[in-house]
Amino acid sequence: MHVTLVEINVKEDKVDQFIEVFRANHLGSIREAGNLRFDVLRDEHIPTRFYIYEAYTDEAAVAIHKTTPHYLQCVEQLAPLMTGPRKKTVFIGLMP
């Protein structure tokens, strides 16, 4: 299992727009054959910080995900909403 935790920091006045943009990516991602989880989380103490917990069957499924229209559109639309680049940490899932 291939797991990625993505941290996204959003401009304060762009939070609602971020949620709408990411909703389309979420809905598309959970329908992908290789997707196991795609959770969108909001930091309890920093309301402009979001985490995306993505679990895929393997790296090939991740590669396919990164070619999907919902992913490509999301990445394009996120750029003006963020305060800086996304931060990614990759894990090997052992016990889901």
Curated annotation (Swiss-Prot):
Chief site of localization: cytoplasm
- Entries under PROSITE patterns matching the protein: ABM
Subcellular compartments: Cytoplasm
A single Gene Ontology MF term assigned here is: (4S)-4-hydroxy-5-phosphonooxypentane-2,3-dione isomerase activity
Protein name in UniProt: (4S)-4-hydroxy-5-phosphonooxypentane-2,3-dione isomerase
What EC number(s) are associated with this protein in UniProt? 5.3.1.32
Q: Which residues form the signal peptide?
A: none
Protein species of origin: Yersinia pestis
